[in-house]
Amino acid sequence: MNADPPRAPRRAPLEAFLTQQWLRRGPVAWALRPLAALYGAAVALRNRRYRLTPGRSVRVGRPVVVIGNRIAGGAGKTPTVIAVLAHLRRQGWQPGVVSRGHGRTALGVQAVAADTPADVVGDEPLLIHLRSGAPVVVGRDRVAAAAALLRARPEIDVIVADDGLQHRRLARDVEVVVFDARGAGNGWLLPAGPLREPIDTPTGAGTALVLYNADRPSTPLPGYATRRALTGAVALAAWWQGTPAAAATLASLRGRPVLACAGIAQPQRFFEQLRHAGLDVQEQALPDHAAFDALPWPAATPDVIVTEKDAVKLPVDRVRRERPGTRVWVAPLDFSPEPAFFAALDTALAPLSPRREG
């Protein structure tokens, strides 16, 4: 390329450092073990209170499927939510979504609309709404968010909770726990390891399913595999209009320099997928949930490719105004859990369906 990338916000040094330390039981992890013990005691006490106190977890009048991670950082939760929503609709359900909305600037409970700024509701809830068309409500209190969702859309007959695995106040019927190739890392709790809670934490759900966003199971827990691949690429303006990505468009970027920009938890995974597709990419890794307050690539950059999670923070008019010479492409991820996973989900939800007779 003709110019080096500008001084964009890079991944937080502490975040990147700990992510590496969490893969092994080295000196840093051992030094953090006392803090992990305190954290573990607090987690165990919280879970015990919910387990022993009837009514502490609130039922909202609809089946609830919670999708989340046992580990810190991205493991494939958002594409799992989108895949589950598509499957539920094919099965005749009318799903809605509740989410905390990580990184949002607004407070309280709020419905997500296609034109809601990502910083108001969070990048992942906005992406889920745009990709699935499902109604989404964000709020730190998932019970309040679910109540608002059902008031606005009473026809909803199943609620999918995005990243609510540790939010015990919302009672759930099914838990989907997502792991990637890191598995449980070094097997220790935060901050000595990546675990938010032990991987074998008793579930408050009737059914717990484990899904591996990896080539093979990465923990001892039995689970299901998923196939993941880039579906292609699409111009940013066309992406906002709902145009699907095309493999031919992605292939057309081969043989020329492309800046790959990613503000996600595991940016290297995105870069590797682009290289696997035959692209010659220059990497620009930003912090997870990067706000894109300033566009991080120089005006001389001819082609930039981003994830969908970042695309929701890039309005077309702004990009054209601030980087008129740059073509921005979006590379969506196709995330396809194996059929046995969906069969298990259907089995768990069948007794809870409002359409069930007798």
UniProtKB/Swiss-Prot annotation:
Molecular function GO terms recorded: ATP binding; tetraacyldisaccharide 4'-kinase activity
Annotated residues for binding of ATP: 71-78
Top EC category: transferase
UniProt keyword annotation of Kinase present: yes
EC number from the UniProt entry: 2.7.1.130
Pathway as given in its UniProt record: Glycolipid biosynthesis; lipid IV(A) biosynthesis; lipid IV(A) from (3R)-3-hydroxytetradecanoyl-[acyl-carrier-protein] and UDP-N-acetyl-alpha-D-glucosamine: step 6/6
Domain of life the protein comes from: Bacteria
Keywords: ATP-binding, Kinase, Lipid A biosynthesis, Lipid biosynthesis, Lipid metabolism, Nucleotide-binding, Transferase
Reaction catalyzed: a lipid A disaccharide + ATP = a lipid IVA + ADP + H(+)
Pfam families registered for this protein in UniProt: LpxK
Gene Ontology BP, a term: lipopolysaccharide core region biosynthetic process
GO CC term, one of those recorded: plasma membrane
InterPro entries hit by this protein: LpxK (IPR003758), P-loop_NTPase (IPR027417)
Keyword Kinase attached: yes
Assigned protein family: Belongs to the LpxK family.
Task of the protein: Transfers the gamma-phosphate of ATP to the 4'-position of a tetraacyldisaccharide 1-phosphate intermediate (termed DS-1-P) to form tetraacyldisaccharide 1,4'-bis-phosphate (lipid IVA).
Annotated PANTHER family: TETRAACYLDISACCHARIDE 4'-KINASE, TETRAACYLDISACCHARIDE 4'-KINASE, MITOCHONDRIAL-RELATED
Protein name listed in UniProt: Tetraacyldisaccharide 4'-kinase
Gene that produces this protein: lpxK
